[in-house]
Amino acid sequence: DPGAAVSDYRQFLEAKAPVPAEQGTPIEAGDIHPMLFPHQRAIVEWAVRGGRRAIFAAFGLGKSVMQLETLRLVTPTDARALVICPLGVRAEFVHDAELLGIDITFVRRTDEIDGPGIYITNYESVRDGKLDVSLFTAVSLDEASVLRSFGSKTYISFLQLFEHTQYRFVATATPSPNRYKELIHYAGFLGVMDTGQALTRFFQRDSTKANNLTLYPHKEAEFWLWLSSWAVFLQSPADLGYPNDGYQLPDLSIEFHQVTTDPSRSLKEDRDGQGRMAVVESLGVESAAAEKRDTT
């Protein structure tokens, strides 16, 4: 039967598609805190069901709220969850946790952990081995892009540290689409696909320039399909078909102010005897004060 043969071949091809399995738990809409906006509720439901997912959302779309609610729903009541974030972001999580009615505890060392619940720490505490991450069932990396600044050694250590963590999430602002290395590093952390396997499967290397990755032309569609199976990219709620109410900025109003100056002021020499054709930027307090005085 030709039809059956085509169907079997289609199933064979679909089985080869690298779509990650769902490793979380399904939830009902009523399980999610009513405070969340529709786009946040949809992402939380998707993340909890997946168990290992990435949330790439632009500033202001509620990454901290979504992470907290996801961890609350995915973590058993007798287990612990951990948010890892830059130190300066801690206050934002504490504030959002209060809005959600979630108790969250900041810790730097293992001996500060006491009982089940949601904890929060900074990247340095994990990097320096001060915190035993094996005590946590779920983890979410906030502003995960900061791992780039720590270097590849820290990234590799994070891969190893959380290799056996059941639920893993990353959240950061939308990465540039051409940051392929960053995207597959996230996939490696989440356990979606080994970094080396992703490099071999999707990319051709540039022998003339290190780390210059180019997608195989015949793999482009598969790559973006694979990416969308474990990561959500969001610039506005409208990207998911939800209203933009509260997220639409007013039209930009530009007002021009012309400051008149004396052109002869620029005809001076600097301390090295070099002539100046224009007034240079004032960086110091003294020069800035002089500039304000001369242009008022």
Where are these regions (language model features)?
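Conserved helix-turn-beta segment of the N-terminal RecA-like "Helicase ATP-binding" lobe
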Residues: 88-111, 190-194
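Conserved P-loop NTPase motor "coupling/switch" region that bridges the ATPase
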Residues: 76-80, 99, 138, 146, ...
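Conserved helicase/translocase motor-coupling segment
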Residues: 239-296
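Short hydrophobic/aromatic beta-strand immediately N-terminal to the Walker A/P-loop
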Residues: 54-58, 82, 169
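Conserved Walker A/P-loop ATP-binding site and its immediately adjacent core
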Residues: 64-69, 78-100, 177-183
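Conserved helix/coil segment N-terminal to the catalytic DExD/H
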Residues: 110-138, 149, 153
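Charged, low-complexity
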Residues: 1-53, 118, 122-124, 134-137
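Walker A/P-loop
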Residues: 50-70
